[in-house]
Amino acid sequence: MAIPEFTMRQLLEAGVHFGHQSHRWNPKMAEYIFGARNNIHIIDLAQTVPLMHRALQAISDTVAKGGRVLFVGTKRQAQDAVADAAKRSAQYFVNSRWLGGTLTNWKTISGSIKRLRHLDDVLNSGDASAYTKKERLTLQRERDKLDRSLGGIKDMGGLPDLIFVIDTNKEDIAIQEAQRLGIPVAAIVDTNCDPKGITYLVPGNDDAGRAIALYCDLIARAVIDGISRAQGDSGIDIGAASRPLREDLPAAQATGFQGLSGPRGTPDDLKKLTGVSGDIEKKFNDLGIFHYWQFAELDHDTVLQIGEEVGLPGRADGWVAQAKGLTAEAE
């Protein structure tokens, strides 16, 4: 894998060079504007190309180090592209209304995510029959409302390491929260936007559907490149990793790790570990891992084997240190 390649012709065909009407411009974007045609500002793609490459490299590097990327695009024409790109690259997204405090008040957001998970469990289990039709409808509406806002981040397990934004004017609250927390921001910045505070600025049209689809595709491919690099750095045979384990090998035997038959008391929230989603947590449970202290006691080779077993070899390196910290907090 490598950083995704693209050409200036692709940018032109997608309409990336079209800015806003010249009277709606932000003077701070002057250095990125080539000129004006029919009162429409034309973005200088000779600058967009290297700046996009820089952003793609930063995103790939972030993921290669085990980081999480949050895609943010709540405008109508960006919603589907943002969600599809995030899902395709196993990352996270917000494509409905940004809830104030999503980053800066993560503790409260985590509580809402727990509520969403609880509603999912209730509505998808036999317990739903214990409620009246009206009560089930009320629960379903609450669940749908939470899912629209939090469905794309319910498996994130913590703050992202970088956010990618379409339309910095519309997503200004998200950007402000990221800046307060020191989280890098990669963003498409149109001629009517303020480039201040954007870590990886990419001048471009943030309204055209084709342009947005191109941006999201490039970012998703950069993320996938980072995942591949992480696997390569860990010495994982990516081709072999794509083949299923032999069915006659029990999971514990495949990893050389002896897990527990069940949790000792209340299981810990393993989704707090880097890159761990709800599905990965279930795989840990299948291996007999329910608690932080189990990770804290593992040696380097064993945790890498477990990471390979659950499909996250590139992110396993930091789990032991994280688990030790979480164990100490719990005590």
From Swiss-Prot:
The gene is rpsB. It comes from Rhodopseudomonas palustris (strain BisB5). Belongs to the universal ribosomal protein uS2 family. The keyword Ribonucleoprotein applies. Disulfide bonds: none annotated. This is Small ribosomal subunit protein uS2. Signal peptide: none annotated. Transmembrane segments: none annotated. GO terms for cellular component: cytosolic small ribosomal subunit. Keywords: Ribonucleoprotein, Ribosomal protein. GO terms for molecular function: structural constituent of ribosome. Pfam families: Ribosomal_S2. PROSITE patterns: RIBOSOMAL_S2_1 (PS00962), RIBOSOMAL_S2_2 (PS00963). GO terms for biological process: translation. The keyword Ribosomal protein applies.
